[in-house]
Structure formats: structure tokens, C-alpha cells
């Protein structure tokens, strides 16, 4: 639909923070919101900034902490600090978005590197890869800021959806499936008994 989106990602934290590094929130040009970066503390503020970025096309890095007057205004009172990256993606970035979607729904991993000085992006795919540094990142699935050639890059690891295999279509499984779906697991329910309440597991 040629919607433009802004992905807001936690790229660094200090002390107590509501969401870990790599947590993301997405805002599109229809004002839809998915995800969170602080559990409600700064979402309204970064939402407004995202709408500005959709218009301007510029990336932005914002920092919030209790010593920042702006942080009190938006409600970040947990005692720590967070830094977030706001990046615009449009239909011209469809190839990148399709790669992320394929990794999430299938298998494999990839890393998107963002140059924090200018917003430039590069993609590192997991196979084949001969770089020991990125191999460790893929193995640990740890997103973080790294320095390459005296430049700060945020390295975001994308991996497939976590899977939960449940053996037995019993009443406890029904509640477990609902909980797993809320937590965004890909659920596989296995039971060879065909008459065990298929209608309850849609």
C-alpha cells in the first residue's frame, strides 16, 4: 500500500530501563502503532517525532534520562537512561523489509547495521559468513552499538520467531496456546488423536 513507516529502536541503556536494547516500536503513515520502547514512558513523544520523520525523511537519535527535563515531561522516572534510534522505511526499502519478514517467518538470521552519524544502512546475512565478529553476534542474538573505522554503528540482530512445541491437545494446552500467541511464539500443537477439540485451537 506504499505506507511509510518509522522504526524506533532502543539502541543503548544505562541503569534501570523498562525495555532492553533491540526493543522496537513501529509507527506508520496511518498513525498505527505496534510495539513499545519504554513500556509507556516515552511512546507518545517518539510517536510525535516519528510523524515528523515520515515527512522529513531524516533519521534521529534521542536520549532520555531522569536528569533531562524532557524526560520528566514524558514520564521516564525509572531512574535509568535510554537512547533510541528513529529510522524511516518506505516502499523503496521493500527489499530490506522483505528480508526481515522472511527471516522472522522462516529460518536464518540477519543483521542491519545503521551508521549513527548519517543513518546509512547495511545488511549482513548469516549464511555464508566468514567474519568472526558477526558470527558471535548471530550466535548470541545480541543487538548493540559497535565502532567500525571510528564510527558508531548500531547492529540490530533479526532472527526467526521463537517456537513452542506442545504435545497433547488437552485443556491446559488451550490456555498455553493463547498465552504463547500473546508472547508472539510460533506454536506447534501435536496430538495424533483427531477428535481432541480441534475447534478450540484455531
Label each residue range with its predicted role.
Residues 1-201:
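Segments forming oxygen-rich coordination pockets for charged ligands
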